[in-house]
Amino acid sequence: MAYTTAQLVTAYTNANLGKAPDAATTLTLDAYATQTQTGGLSDAAALTNTLKLVNSTTAVAIQTYQFFTGVAPSAAGLDFLVDSTTNTNDLNDAYYSKFAQENRFINFSINLATGAGAGATAFAAAYTGVSYAQTVATAYDKIIGNAVATAAGVDVAAAVAFLSRQANIDYLTAFVRANTPFTAAADIDLAVKAALIGTILNAATVSGIGGYATATAAMINDLSDGALSTDNAAGVNLFTAYPSSGVSGSTLSLTTGTDTLTGTANNDTFVAGEVAGAATLTVGDTLSGGAGTDVLNWVQAAAVTALPTGVTISGIETMNVTSGAAITLNTSSGVTGLTALNTNTSGAAQTVTAGAGQNLTATTAAQAANNVAVDGGANVTVASTGVTSGTTTVGANSAASGTVSVSVANSSTTTTGAIAVTGGTAVTVAQTAGNAVNTTLTQADVTVTGNSSTTAVTVTQTAAATAGATVAGRVNGAVTITDSAAASATTAGKIATVTLGSFGAATIDSSALTTVNLSGTGTSLGIGRGALTATPTANTLTLNVNGLTTTGAITDSEAAADDGFTTINIAGSTASSTIASLVAADATTLNISGDARVTITSHTAAALTGITVTNSVGATLGAELATGLVFTGGAGADSILLGATTKAIVMGAGDDTVTVSSATLGAGGSVNGGDGTDVLVANVNGSSFSADPAFGGFETLRVAGAAAQGSHNANGFTALQLGATAGATTFTNVAVNVGLTVLAAPTGTTTVTLANATGTSDVFNLTLSSSAALAAGTVALAGVETVNIAATDTNTTAHVDTLTLQATSAKSIVVTGNAGLNLTNTGNTAVTSFDASAVTGTGSAVTFVSANTTVGEVVTIRGGAGADSLTGSATANDTIIGGAGADTLVYTGGTDTFTGGTGADIFDINAIGTSTAFVTITDAAVGDKLDLVGISTNGAIADGAFGAAVTLGAAATLAQYLDAAAAGDGSGTSVAKWFQFGGDTYVVVDSSAGATFVSGADAVIKLTGLVTLTTSAFATEVLTLA
């Protein structure tokens, strides 16, 4: 008939319990209506699509209430939950607008299953003591149905394993802790299980697969006409009201006697529990499930040792076995129609064999030293927690016909027991280490042996780490992966893809291998290609790396010619990776691609003829390339080492770095930096690259390396850098505005000679850049009047660099940056301005001693934010300004003016001065110190309070005050006195015998302003102002 937009709006509004669609949803409904009118969409499809739009509201209420209370809400209940005038937090109100659909299912599930929730009591009774994996497995089968999902193309075992993986449990546990009031472990456990069920309900709703989704869709369709035909004030049983081909059937409980039980045509549940401690699944029992999708729950405290003699089970699709002790079970005979076997125990061993076509999930909590061994089955999942030395073995006697998934968690410091898997189409082994900080756990060695069906293997572990006060130590276990045909000379292998996430010493042996995915921490990896005598048809290996760091080599262990990989493709993604060594004897081509940096610290590949990099971030090759190898760079920042290459090397568009060990290249050789700001690193004794046409396209010249020293012509370069060197280094012909950056501690003096230093205002910029304290050595600059020094800390840990500067023409030194600087100012007698006021960071102390020798010269010295040490000249008149830190300002003579700045400063008086040439302190304040050790020439000034000031009449002169303060005999023990005169305060140290102030023997320090020193006290000749 074709729908109108108004009709679909009405249907939506009814299904949404009266809440009309918003503008965007209305546009969607208009599109559906138009499609029915043009023939692009059937009426049924348009209505179905319309009603799916209330999955995040109405469907949430229907499904969660059905699962946790046994009935869906009545019409009135749905009105209250979905769109109510009295419920201010219904599903269409602002409160839930921030919730995605899945989180709405989780929220409703937790609220119903815990605390005072309507289903809390029943949920606790059913799920307390049940593992997370078992919760997921049974809920998945109940909500979606294993058979239904399998028919729809879903890998049920993989889905269950994914939902019950430890990372998801950890996430949901953290979510529950953060978003609920629960603190007790039991409450949190139940809330996490409810959240898992909410996740499955959402998955069913999104996919539309399973009984819950089908019945819910039918109920919403019923609502869409404005009335609920099945309404019941007590709630609507979803499956009774909207029956499908498979609905909940009967619950049949076994007795301690011999039982013969037959299910209905619906989905029945058989319960084999205990009666007065006695098992109810006993000798001779016969269980027939009938036509539905049926479940047998076998629960007993005692060990399960086998199916009791004579027991016959048929037509039951799922068997859940829970024991308080060990489980030994074989369902490969005596059981027909079984598609899922789920076993669960705690603190005990499991030995389980599943029959053909049976998906097996074996869950063990607190496994400890107990062993788990499973055989047979289709898709097999083994999930163990609390493992110590217990081993895990899969397929030793009979391999799974489908996938194999093993997860093992160990929180102790006992080495995890070995894990061994044989067979399976795709094998996944995941280890999780949860030991405490400052302890070390060695993870399990993993052995995977393929069979003729095994094509892919994944092994992951928690990344290795060294134990410390805040770090848990982890050691990765060895990994051995062997194809079933590895030993065959005639049969080709099957394992084509291997994924390793953190690994110890690892080996892979398969002639079919084409792809290896690596991440995390790794020790070493050896890749073999089996014993196949024929040359492998695929000689290309793809290594996908993501955040990988290895301590050893990745080795193609096939040494025979033409037997190893000839092309290796390395792709970096997400996070940068470092491979300590790449060994590939047969490789002729290496391609490096991706969007995360790849570093290969060293490589051994004698046959290699070409390396091509297309990685957008760049690649670093730490070993020198063979002289006959062609390298082609990409758009990223690539870094390589060259000798006397005979090839034309083009670096590409990035900011590249090329290190050369020869100042001249081989015949026909050349290297071009390409676009970008490129660095040419001279690891040679002297160079003149600008004169050699073989070198081009480089903007920065860096001298660094074990052979780096000598004279280097800087002509043509716009920047200079210096690293660790073998000896003294000279940069010549340095152009104007070309600076030098020191990156590492050099050996010997570094001399910079300008191309033209005849001017009187030459400026040179010197940068010290490092993450830790840098000993920059001696830098000599000739003919430079201004030296700008930037001390740059490249991380957040404060440090102080050291530098000796020889710049005898310099008049001004300016220091900036976020690192401190201890500057040795050698021979720079012309400097009249030292300015470190732009240095930031309280840990960035600056040390400077003026070397100015001109009598009466005015010299200005400024400190920065750190605790600086600034020393004036003995001959010049210095103005020293400390800045923000707790500085030390040192007086060595002359008429000086000191300003400490903020912070508790130390004014170190190391020269006596005269009655007219002395130091003035402009901002002496409480907490500051006057260090007078250097001027008390006749014995220590006595400790204790300073006491009262010397006072004279109003007409007294400064000279009279000085005489009065020095009237005592200081020839035996120096005596300190103080007085105030002319609005300022003076401290006198009397070290002479006379009764007057003796200039040159006695000392005076002026404090600007009236500073009361009565309670200030001496300790070891240091006066602390109070």
Curated annotation (Swiss-Prot):
InterPro entries: Hemolysn_Ca-bd, Serralysin-like_metalloprot_C. One of its GO terms (molecular function) is calcium ion binding. Keywords: Calcium, Cell wall, S-layer, Secreted. It is found in: Secreted, Cell wall, S-layer. GO terms for cellular component: extracellular region; S-layer. The calcium binding of this protein may mediate surface attachment by ionic bridging between the S-layer and a specific membrane-associated oligosaccharide. The S-layer is a paracrystalline mono-layered assembly of proteins which coats the surface of bacteria. Probably acts as a physical barrier to parasites and lytic enzymes. This is S-layer protein. It comes from Caulobacter vibrioides (strain ATCC 19089 / CIP 103742 / CB 15).
